[in-house]
Swiss-Prot record:
This is Phosphoheptose isomerase. GO terms for molecular function: carbohydrate derivative binding; D-sedoheptulose 7-phosphate isomerase activity; zinc ion binding. Keywords: Carbohydrate metabolism, Cytoplasm, Isomerase, Metal-binding, Zinc. Catalyzes the isomerization of sedoheptulose 7-phosphate in D-glycero-D-manno-heptose 7-phosphate. Binds 1 zinc ion per subunit. GO terms for biological process: carbohydrate metabolic process; D-glycero-D-manno-heptose 7-phosphate biosynthetic process. Its EC number is 5.3.1.28. It comes from Bradyrhizobium sp. (strain BTAi1 / ATCC BAA-1182). Zn(2+) binds at residues 64, 68, 175, 183.
């Protein structure tokens, strides 16, 4: 690897470290994350489920978070219900073909979501039509709505019961903050649910 590549990677790591440090000191983000964990715990304790949506890298995050809830984060425990609505290629392509991509998640929320469930919608920009439509449909169906976005995505909050805002406008850094915070939320959820079993 040449020096220029080393410098680019080092620069990214330095910016990533600084962004994580800002997030760790962001009292609004931390408070929001705690409330989000509590809302998800309430739903899972009641036998409800967590639905998760996102596009691109946020779709990967949706799958990652669902895996932590259904599988386990760190502790051996019963499985809990979480579904990433980003994984069913037949549903995604059928809905996209018949209704348009803007409705690929809303249609699934309509079919799978019930009152008392939670929708976690991840959008770094806060402006993705497919994500906003999913939130609207979730509201119609009585789901608790949670959003993850970046510094420029505050308008998304109008559709969310709780909005977590990563303190950055750089998409890769927003994604890193989202996933790191999601891990903290998963650990909090797991600790609360494990306490129920003790």
């Amino acid at each position: 690897m040449n020096r220029a590549a080393d410098d680019l990677i080092a620069s990214h790591l330095a910016r990533s470290h600084a962004a994580m440090a800002r997030a760790a000191q962001d009292t609004a983000l931390l408070a929001s994350a705690g409330r989000i964990a509590a809302k998800i715990v309430t739903a899972l304790r009641s036998g409800r489920k967590l639905l998760i949506v996102g596009n691109g890298g946020s779709a990967a995050d949706a799958q990652h978070i669902a895996a932590e809830i259904v599988g386990r984060y760190k502790q051996e425990r019963p499985a809990f219900a979480a579904i990433a609505l980003t994984t069913d290629t037949s549903a995604l392509t059928a809905i996209g073909n018949d209704y348009g991509f803007d409705h690929v998640f809303a249609r699934q929320v309509e079919g799978l979501g019930t009152s008392g469930d939670v929708l976690l919608a991840i959008s770094t920009s806060g402006r993705s039509p497919s994500i906003l439509n999913a939130l609207r449909k979730a509201r119609e169906r009585g789901l608790t709505t949670i959003g993850f976005t970046g510094a420029n995505g505050l308008a998304m909050g109008e559709l969310c019961d709780e909005l977590l805002v990563a303190p950055s406008d750089d998409t890769p850094l927003i994604q890193q903050i989202h996933l790191a915070t999601a891990h903290g939320i998963c650990e909090t959820i797991e600790a609360a649910l494990m306490q129920d079993l003790s």
